[in-house]
């Protein structure tokens, strides 16, 4: 082999030329023996040496990884392609940007693959995106999709910013479509909203029920303490009046006790004025009673771990939902009355 390889010349492209592969090879001219080159054409045969895989490794494919989530557009609609965790199959979801929301998209994922226990969408900086956000708004920027505690970075294609006239026309079209949809499906929308409000009211009442029980117990104790304090004040004033009468008629004379009663009345006026400066409220028995009741209530709430802010928030939400439900039912009644009147005519 070394002798055979010594007669071969390596070509730049990794090809090796063998002496046995030449047809009628031409020898170099010897000393004093010049020969002319033959006129017949020469055929050069080449043989490939080396590892062919080395050259094939330079070619790279464009196949996407199986676990990558991509967003593409087809016929103007976004296509979200991902791998289902249970079946390990690639699945495409067609997104309607103006109708689909983040919540409906996540629900579609869970309906398609029951192995998806948790799914959420967050922004690139980690802020959670509400379920009511439209997919059109979501696809404007990059975001992250969390499926069963696995995070996937999704990069969205940048869309060309439309002109001002196009945006105005698009907004007008959206408004027109929304009005037409509302007019054609008004009764269905109102009934759906009524069911939603009733479910919300039931949920709020369910949350308020244990809080109401704790609040009633705290109010009863606070009321008892406030009443006891008022009775103690009445007893103190009675003792003061009895002491002044005893000193006036049995111990001293009125001439001596008159200045004492005057300064006592003046001291009471100072106390009332100080109460106004501190509390910014007039000194009345009703305001004093309410203030003392609230003090007892908040102290006992802290001891019982009763969240007053949460209770007030739930009560406000319940009042708002009840008012909205009454408004929806009023609209439904007016609509039914109008239909009945038109049928009679």
Curated annotation (Swiss-Prot):
It is found in: Mitochondrion inner membrane. One of its GO terms (cellular component) is mitochondrial inner membrane. The chain crosses the membrane at residues 229-249, 259-279. Residues 188-221, 306-334 form a coiled coil. Detected in lung, brain and heart, and at lower levels in white fat, skeletal muscle and spleen. Detected at very low levels in kidney and liver. Highly expressed in macrophages during the progression of skeletal muscle regeneration. Residues 1-44 form a transit peptide. Keywords: Calcium, Calcium transport, Coiled coil, Ion transport, Membrane, Mitochondrion, Mitochondrion inner membrane, Transit peptide, Transmembrane, Transmembrane helix, Transport. One of its GO terms (biological process) is mitochondrial calcium ion homeostasis. GO terms for molecular function: calcium channel inhibitor activity. Pfam families: MCU. It is a multi-pass membrane protein. Disruption phenotype: Impaired macrophage differentiation program, characterized by macrophage inability to efficiently acquire the anti-inflammatory profile. Mice show delayed muscle cell regeneration through exhaustion of the satellite cell pool. Conditional deletion in skeletal muscle affects mitochondrial metabolism by shifting energy metabolism toward glucose oxidation. Negative regulator of the mitochondrial calcium uniporter (MCU), a channel that mediates calcium uptake into the mitochondrial matrix. MCUB is required to limit mitochondrial calcium overload during stress. Acts as a dominant-negative regulator that displaces MCU from the functional uniplex complex and thereby decreases the association of calcium sensors MICU1 and MICU2, preventing channel gating. Mitochondrial calcium homeostasis plays key roles in mitochondrial metabolism. Homooligomer. Associates with the uniplex complex, composed of MCU, MICU1, MICU2 and EMRE/SMDT1, inhibiting its activity. Belongs to the MCU (TC 1.A.77) family. This is Calcium uniporter regulatory subunit MCUb, mitochondrial. It comes from Mus musculus (Mouse).
